[in-house]
Amino acid sequence: MIRPFEEQDSADVVALSLRAWGPVHDSLREVMGDELFDLRHRPDWKAQQQRDVESVLSDDANRAWVAEQGQGVVGFAAATIRPEDDLGEVLMVAVDPSNQGRGLGTELTEVATDWIRESGMSVAFISTGGDPGHRPARRTYAKAGYRELPIAYYFKAL
């Protein structure tokens, strides 16, 4: 069941996001190398990810949803709209590893996209990495009807 996020879900959402994004960060470390990865994810990726998730969940401009199974939260998505640009962004999607590969990420992405559409926006977008760790996310977004735009980001340790 997917329902709107409630404040009491926050700790569960943070915990599942850390589990879900562990393999992604392992892949990023491999692609970026230890030095650059550590510089980019100070003090460590888990602390940064927790701050990022908590920030998205606490921002009143955003909307979030959770997927429940049994008594637990097993996935979430968050989105925002930018009326001045006539677009919305799916900010985050995460599914607990034990529930991945069953279409839940696509379903959460579609719920967020529906909210963007219902908010009157003409375009929705989502961004993700091109590294191997983000391959499941890219498949999820393609299944939800998003088209990939090849964009490259370059980083350099200073």
Language-model-detected regions and their locations in the chain:
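Acetyl-CoA-dependent GNAT
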Residues: P4-L91, D96, T109, W115, ...
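Conserved acetyl-CoA-binding loop of GNAT-fold acetyltransferases
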Residues: Y141-I151
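Structural preference for beta-strand elements that scaffold enzyme active sites
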Residues: L87, V123-F125
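Residue-level "edge-of-site" marker
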Residues: E84, G129, Y154
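A cross-family glycoside hydrolase active-site/sugar-binding cleft signature
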Residues: L91, S127, A152
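Conserved beta-strand-loop-alpha-helix junction that forms the acyl-donor binding cleft
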Residues: P97-Q100, F125-A137, A157-L158
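Conserved acetyl-CoA-binding loop-helix of GNAT-fold acetyltransferases
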Residues: M92-V95, G101-D114, E118, R139, ...
